[in-house]
């Protein structure tokens, strides 16, 4: 699958507008975020599910009271069931309908670059932390993708950089592990998330990086 340096591919979901572009190098700054498109030893693409949804986290950060929630109905479909129950418990008026009990906040594994570490050292550290030390890195791919995500709900733009990461563990190895990380609740195969809004662009990212090893 070819993907030139000048080519930009755009995906849109109900919540996001995502630009994917191949670049030569990852810039180093205090705000650089890097992510790993992890592939198991038996060839499965991995994805993380956040413990808390971005929507619920944003609501909590904007509250001035412990007892009152002010929530846009547009956010409700992007929250976990237990988060919706907490909102419902605090409602003074209105109701919550059309709850999706199967919602998951899918994310690529990775995080913010520390100024004293290399890109690969950052990814090794993040994967170790987010998997509770269950994931170890075999090798990294050579292709780098720049991901520019426009969040239509919060009117914010996020930039991250992604590369393939081939790990030593199989999907079976990871399926029997429990994760207690504060951010990640589960690591699973992207193939199990075909009905998720993010599946199309995430699978595109993996296909580009895997086929460019």
Curated annotation (Swiss-Prot):
<keyword id="KW-0464">Manganese</keyword>
<protein>
    <recommendedName>
        <fullName>mRNA-decapping protein OPG121</fullName>
    </recommendedName>
</protein>
<feature type="domain" description="Nudix hydrolase">
    <location>
        <begin position="30"/>
        <end position="209"/>
    </location>
</feature>
<dbReference type="Pfam" id="PF00293">
    <property type="entry name" value="NUDIX"/>
</dbReference>
<comment type="function">
    <text>Acts with RNA polymerase to initiate transcription from late gene promoters.</text>
</comment>
<comment type="similarity">
    <text>Belongs to the Nudix hydrolase family.</text>
</comment>
<feature type="binding site">
    <location>
        <position position="16"/>
    </location>
    <ligand>
        <name>N(7)-methyl-GTP</name>
    </ligand>
</feature>
<dbReference type="InterPro" id="IPR000086">
    <property type="entry name" value="NUDIX_hydrolase_dom"/>
</dbReference>
<comment type="subunit">
    <text>Interacts with the late transcription elongation factor VLTF-4/OPG110. Interacts with the late transcription factors VLTF-1.</text>
</comment>
<feature type="binding site">
    <location>
        <position position="183"/>
    </location>
    <ligand>
        <name>Mg(2+)</name>
    </ligand>
</feature>
<feature type="binding site">
    <location>
        <position position="151"/>
    </location>
    <ligand>
        <name>N(7)-methyl-GTP</name>
    </ligand>
</feature>
<feature type="binding site">
    <location>
        <position position="50"/>
    </location>
    <ligand>
        <name>N(7)-methyl-GTP</name>
    </ligand>
</feature>
<dbReference type="InterPro" id="IPR015797">
    <property type="entry name" value="NUDIX_hydrolase-like_dom_sf"/>
</dbReference>
<dbReference type="InterPro" id="IPR003300">
    <property type="entry name" value="Viral_VD9"/>
</dbReference>
<dbReference type="GO" id="GO:0016787">
    <property type="term" value="F:hydrolase activity"/>
</dbReference>
<keyword id="KW-0479">Metal-binding</keyword>
<keyword id="KW-0378">Hydrolase</keyword>
<feature type="short sequence motif" description="Nudix box">
    <location>
        <begin position="111"/>
        <end position="132"/>
    </location>
</feature>
<feature type="binding site">
    <location>
        <position position="130"/>
    </location>
    <ligand>
        <name>Mg(2+)</name>
    </ligand>
</feature>
<feature type="binding site">
    <location>
        <position position="126"/>
    </location>
    <ligand>
        <name>Mg(2+)</name>
    </ligand>
</feature>
<dbReference type="GO" id="GO:0046872">
    <property type="term" value="F:metal ion binding"/>
</dbReference>
<keyword id="KW-0460">Magnesium</keyword>
């Amino acid at each position: 699958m070819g993907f030139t340096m000048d080519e930009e591919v755009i995906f849109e979901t109900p919540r996001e507008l995502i630009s994917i572009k191949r670049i030569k190098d990852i810039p180093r700054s205090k705000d650089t975020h890097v992510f790993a498109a992890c592939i198991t030893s038996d060839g499965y693409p991995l994805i993380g599910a956040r413990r808390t949804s971005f929507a619920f986290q944003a609501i909590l950060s904007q509250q001035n009271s412990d007892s009152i929630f002010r929530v846009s109905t547009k956010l409700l479909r992007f929250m976990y069931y237990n988060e919706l129950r907490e909102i419902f418990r605090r409602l003074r008026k209105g109701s919550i309908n059309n709850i999706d009990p199967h919602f998951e906040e899918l994310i690529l594994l990775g995080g913010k670059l520390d100024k004293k570490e290399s890109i690969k050292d950052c990814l090794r550290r993040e994967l170790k932390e987010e998997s509770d030390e269950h994931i170890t890195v075999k090798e990294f791919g050579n292709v780098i993708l720049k991901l520019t995500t426009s969040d239509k709900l919060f009117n914010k733009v996020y930039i991250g950089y992604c590369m393939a990461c081939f790990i030593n563990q199989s999907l079976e190895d990871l399926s029997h592990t429990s994760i207690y990380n504060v951010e990640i609740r589960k690591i699973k195969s992207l193939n199990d998330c075909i009905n998720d809004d993010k599946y199309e662009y995430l699978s595109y990212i993996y296909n580009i990086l895997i086929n460019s090893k």
